[in-house]
Amino acid sequence: MKEERHYIFNHGQLLLRNNGQTYEIPRKPISAIKNLHLFGEHDNLLLYTSESCANEVELPQGYEWIGLRESFNLLPRPIYIEAGKASEILYFDTHHQYCGICGAHMEWHTPISKRCEVCGEEIWPQLNTAIIVLVHRGDEALLVKAKSFRRNFYGLLAGFVE
């Protein structure tokens, strides 16, 4: 039987286990979950994503809810990329329950696509191509700080390609 890795979200927060030196993704759910999806396999691990059922979940010692963006500095890069994909799959499922053609219920067809039970319309998560521009002068880079940033973050200039 293959081992599992569970990317569990609650209001945009990712459940992480702090083992004292590093953070890791839980190997099994620690509370009631909903919208469980198998979204891949990596290093002989089955990758699942789901949402926590409760608004306020009392966590066992060593577990924390951490924002996906904040987890960037806490998780190894491959795990962070998997967490991003897990979040995308949940978003896709939440926002594509019904067919845009006939209004019937959509069912999962593949790990990353849904198909209408009535008309056969198949959809995949939308790709939004973005461009990031580095504005620099010598060794200095132009960064921006938006009022909407909750913490002391600076970002590059970015925009979407139409």
Identify the residue ranges that each predicted region occupies.
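Phosphate-interacting basic helix/loop segments used at nucleotide- and nucleic-acid interfaces
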Residues: 85
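Short, basic and Ser/Thr-rich N-terminal targeting/leader segments
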Residues: 32-33, 43, 93, 100, ...
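Residues immediately within or flanking Cys/His clusters that coordinate Zn2+
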Residues: 93-96, 103, 113
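Cys/His-rich microdomains that often coordinate metals
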Residues: 103-106, 123
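N-terminal alpha-helical interaction blocks
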Residues: 1-77
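Cys/His-rich Zn2+-binding cysteine-cluster or related metal-binding knuckle/ribbon modules and their
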Residues: 88-97, 108
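N-terminal strand-loop-strand
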Residues: 110-156
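Extended serine/threonine-enriched, polar tracts that run as long, contiguous segments within proteins
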Residues: 160-162
